């Protein structure tokens, strides 16, 4: 939202004026460095997904998130295809790393209730956004089951996130700082989530989320999107700003104690990747 963008920019400016990184303005460092989970593994050919997972395993990520490619309209055959891919990824990453699963609101309540018993044996850390974001009762019902449910990236306010927590609709809260009102609103949500003993793992990577994670004990890890190609959405900001830390060395991110603000600047060096039509 527009107010989110303005709020994030103001925090960046305050940090630059104070000569301090934003995470210090938010309370300071709560962890030596930030553990990250690998967020890619889009549904595709099984051998390609396993090859991607094998390469990512070399980097030291604490977890791996994969996406489902099949939903209710695909019937039992689609269920089997979903399960094949989850099994293939779990086979590569083993049982010492977390496995996260995302449906991105592509399922309905009935389909999800049929899938969960089949997924339970893979011991996922969470099942993300299985149904449409507004189905609060559905989320609460699913969250009473054996697999923790995560969500919140499509909430646009403190109130919306508070309702998720009050209704015990999620076991992991994943607000999007770009939507809920920026860093100011995110900090309020963090406090409410901590009071409910629900961990917060902000949606997507992005520097403002890393600062929030660094400054909050209740934010244990960060989502990390490795940059392969231009992807309009979660990765586009990597081509507009420079200065984001790289987690590809050991699966952890570090923030500079001496870099003021968010620590990023606008760049035009990737313009050749974009085709501009007038």
Predicted features along the sequence, with ranges:
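Metal-dependent enolase-superfamily TIM-barrel catalytic cores that perform enediolate-based chemistry
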Residues: 33-141, 145
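Shared catalytic-loop signature of beta/alpha-barrel
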Residues: 123, 134-148, 152-252
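Proline-centered loop/turn at the N-terminus of a beta-strand
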Residues: 21, 35, 98, 148, ...
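Metal- or metallocofactor-binding catalytic centers and their adjacent structured scaffolds
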Residues: 1-17
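C-terminal extensions of enzymes
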Residues: 235-278
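Conserved, mostly hydrophobic/aromatic
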Residues: 6, 19, 64, 102, ...
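Short, flexible active-site-proximal loops enriched in glycine and acidic residues
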Residues: 1, 17-29
